[in-house]
From Swiss-Prot:
Belongs to the universal ribosomal protein uS12 family. This is Small ribosomal subunit protein uS12. The keyword Ribonucleoprotein applies. The gene is rpsL. The modification 3-methylthioaspartic acid is found at D89. CDD domains: Ribosomal_S12. One of its GO terms (cellular component) is small ribosomal subunit. The keyword tRNA-binding applies. Disulfide bonds: none annotated. Residues 1-26 are annotated as: Disordered. It comes from Clostridium tetani (strain Massachusetts / E88). It holds the Pfam family Ribosom_S12_S23. SUPFAM superfamilies: Nucleic acid-binding proteins.
Amino acid sequence: MPTINQLVRKSRKTVKAQSDSPALKNCPQRRGVCTVVKTTTPKKPNSALRKIARVRLTNGYEVSAYIPGVGHNLQEHSVVLIRGGRVKDLPGVRYHIVRGALDSAGVATRMQSRSKYGAKKPKQK
């Protein structure tokens, strides 16, 4: 506990909130180029092969981004759009790739939550 004199000499510092997605630099999305596309396994209670991509952003950062949905067409040198949003069971993956934007195709067979996966409305018969 500081004394009054100590507080007069040097006041308390306010704690600044840290960003959950620092590589975006306060932008809603960023464009980047895939350097590696691979699969990883999640943390302990879960088991799967999660698809991720290492992306070099236009501002020079290189981040890991999750590829949501079933199936994808991404490979090295694909240009993608990333947004914030971590994947809870993949340590170090703090970004999501936006499906249906730039080189990333939408999920073809998606019927529900289509806007989140860049899927077009199916033709009515």
